Amino acid sequence: MSINLTLDIYIYFLNNARSLCGKQRSKQLHFVCSKQYWRMNHVNVHREFHTSKKSCKWNRSEAHCSKHWHSPSNHGLHFGIVRLSTSAPKGLTKVSIHMSRIKSTLNSVSKAIFGSQNEMVTRLAQFKPSSRILRKVSDKGWLKQKNVKQAVESLKNYSDKSAGKNSLAEQKSYFADKEEDSGKHSLFHYTYGITTRFGESFSVLANHINSYFKSKGKMSQTKEDKQLQDKPDLEERKSSSPGPDTVADRPDSESPLEVKDKLSSPTQMPEAHPVSAKQSIANFLSRPTEGVQALVGGYIGGLVPKLKSDPKSPPEEQEVSAKTEQAVNKDKKAEEKKRVLLQQEKIIARVSIDNRTRALVQALRRTADPKLCITRVEELTFHLLEFPEGKGVAIKEKIIPYLLRLRQVKDETLQAAVREILALIGYVDPVKGRGIRILTIDGGGTRGVVALQTLRKLVELTQKPIHQLFDYICGVSTGAILAFMLGLFHMPLDECEELYRKLGSDVFTQNVIVGTVKMSWSHAFYDSNTWEKILKDRIGSALMIETARNPACPKVAAISTIVNRGQTPKAFVFRNYGHFPGTNSHYLGGCQYKMWQAIRASSAAPGYFAEYALGSDLHQDGGLLLNNPSALALHECKCIWPDTPLECIVSLGTGRYESDVRNTSTYTSLKTKLSNVISSATDTEEVHIMLDGLLPSDTYFRFNPVICENIPLDESRDEKLDQLQLEGMKYIERNDQKMKKVAKILSQEKTTLQKINDWIKLKSDMYEGLPFFSKL
């Protein structure tokens, strides 16, 4: 690779008086000839003037020197030239120079895009030594104004006209040096040594780079200027004293061969020191043939590692892919092994559960003592509560016939324990009337006093308590409270209404400020802990399934909404019964929960009480999904009594408010939209319309009075509750015929044929597997 040294100033010495200055390309250049490169024939000066042209070319291994002798006596011109630039001439190779520059630029861009980062770093490292040489040469002697003056003064003896021209060259050189010194203040500037013309784009790029690096290089530039001002004498002495870097001041005894040896010696090469960041761009641009290449390569090279990663060799890629595949296979094997182990554990657990169930059933069948039977029955009950999948094994072991026969024993405690385990397994007794009778109560807070007025009228017409009128009672939120008080605790309506009002006054009394703080903290205006404490004191900690011990208790359910299973809320049924194995309900639920937990979960209205966590499920008010549980109750009854017809469904609402004001606006606000969404979720009339159209006539009865005021759920003032009670009574009076029809249906007794069928079914279940006559 050839190394080109470019000088900012060239000095010509012309012996001809016509011209002192020469032109190279578009710039006026001056050259001076050293004594070692020319000689004069002292014998006959006018006859012949011998000059020698010294051309030097350096590369990495050697330096080539050549002499060209000229005898221009015909032209009367005698000159000697020293040229330390090996840049391409302007003559015949002009086109090839431009093409090589374009080719170098394209090669640099292609290498920046497709090459690796290491190749770019190697490419940039090659520019630094030449830039160092350029700085060293330009600073030492040839660019200094005083050296030019000394060279011109030493040549005054040959021509007087040359002296005048040399003064002109001196002024040109002075201004050139001044421009160079002023250009040093900018990081990116144009020097006269650059032979490549950039045009307008060069100025735009230079201004952009100088403005970007100006703040960073300000301190170092100030320090450098100060050092130059403090040592002017030292620079002057260095420029005037002979040195190895100044060609014009070399001694005469030094031959060109010695110069060649020194330049070819690797130990005499100038040491390449790291160049500062503010000078690196100028050094790249100072190279006439590779300036653009260095500039493009220097700026794009830093972006290539970010845009393109280093290509990996095929063995490395294969090794990485093999490791990745091995890791994936290892994970798959571990996952498969874990799945197999889990499956084995489930199988072992299921086998152990089945074995435990068989052992308990066989132990119960071998027991003859009534007291020991109670213990065995309770053990089996707790086992099936913990592992419901064991019910199928117990049925296969003929547990139902034995329990039915055991229920005939005259022991109330044993009979209660047997009724509980039969309800848990899913065995049910026949219904009370001619068909299934269902009572459902909507949610609505303290507006439940409206439903109490309807129930009071039914009790008055039938002369029977509520728990004897219906086979299945289901409620949501406040309706669940009424269902438990009437169906499980068998409270009279007067006592139930009094307790209902007391619960409202105890729970729905809260300071506004305290409630607002609680709302922001737990999203509940009222104290949920107080509500839980009241429920525990009033209801107790008995399990739902334990209520089946009482033969007079109907099937009771409370509805809540699970909000953390899947993307949509799901209804959850707290039951006091279990489904027979093989019967699948559409709704989640269980009978192993406590009664107060069921009411707490069903009444967790958002904004009023905090949501209730029960196990891994998060429960909220059932009214969010099914505020009218009539359809759910009908489905559950079909699962319990699949072969029994439906006699009637009585659905009780807590009052509805319908405004006659019509909004004529063409759009609705966000508040109105949210209110409509909430109203549609808690709407009860759509279910009523659906069931009324699907069920047979005189089967579905809905009682939901229209109230004149939109009373909130947490209303606890007595005057407002009395107003609701009065509106409920007026509604009953207007629908007196409808109430009488319901009372008549509920008062009907079973026919004789139905009673015989029930007796036969009981005997067949009790003596399953025995001959027919033994069942009688």
Swiss-Prot record:
Chain span(s) of sequence motif DGA/G: 621-623
Observed phenotype of the null mutant: Mutants display multiple bioenergetic dysfunctional phenotypes, including growth retardation, cold intolerance, reduced exercise endurance, greatly increased mortality from cardiac stress after transverse aortic constriction, abnormal mitochondrial function with a 65% decrease in ascorbate-induced Complex IV-mediated oxygen consumption, and a reduction in myocardial cardiolipin content accompanied by an altered cardiolipin molecular species composition. Myocardium of mutant mice contain more oxidized cardiolipin.
Enzyme Commission number(s) of this protein: 3.1.1.-, 3.1.1.5
InterPro entries: Acyl_Trfase/lysoPLipase, PNPLA8-like, PNPLA_dom
List of residues that carry N6-succinyllysine: 730
Positions bearing carbohydrate: 4, 157
Catalytic reaction annotation: a 1,2-diacyl-sn-glycero-3-phosphocholine + H2O = a 1-acyl-sn-glycero-3-phosphocholine + a fatty acid + H(+); a 1,2-diacyl-sn-glycero-3-phosphocholine + H2O = a 2-acyl-sn-glycero-3-phosphocholine + a fatty acid + H(+); a 1,2-diacyl-sn-glycero-3-phosphoethanolamine + H2O = a 1-acyl-sn-glycero-3-phosphoethanolamine + a fatty acid + H(+); a 1-O-(1Z-alkenyl)-2-acyl-sn-glycero-3-phosphocholine + H2O = a 1-O-(1Z-alkenyl)-sn-glycero-3-phosphocholine + a fatty acid + H(+)
Residue ranges crossing the lipid bilayer per the database entry: 469-489
GO annotation terms (biological process): arachidonate metabolic process; arachidonate secretion; cardiolipin metabolic process; fatty acid metabolic process; intracellular signal transduction; linoleic acid metabolic process; lipid homeostasis; phosphatidylcholine catabolic process
Taxonomy, superkingdom: Eukaryota
Summary of the tissues where the protein is detected: Expressed in myocardium (at protein level).
Ranges where the PNPLA domain occurs: 439-634
Pathway named in the protein's UniProt entry: Phospholipid metabolism
Entry keyword set: Endoplasmic reticulum, Glycoprotein, Hydrolase, Lipid degradation, Lipid metabolism, Membrane, Mitochondrion, Peroxisome, Transmembrane, Transmembrane helix
GO MF entries: calcium-independent phospholipase A2 activity; lysophospholipase activity; phospholipase A1 activity
Residue ranges of the motif GXSXG: 475-479
Name of this protein: Calcium-independent phospholipase A2-gamma
Naturally occurring in which organism (per UniProt): Mus musculus (Mouse)
Gene assigned in the entry: Pnpla8
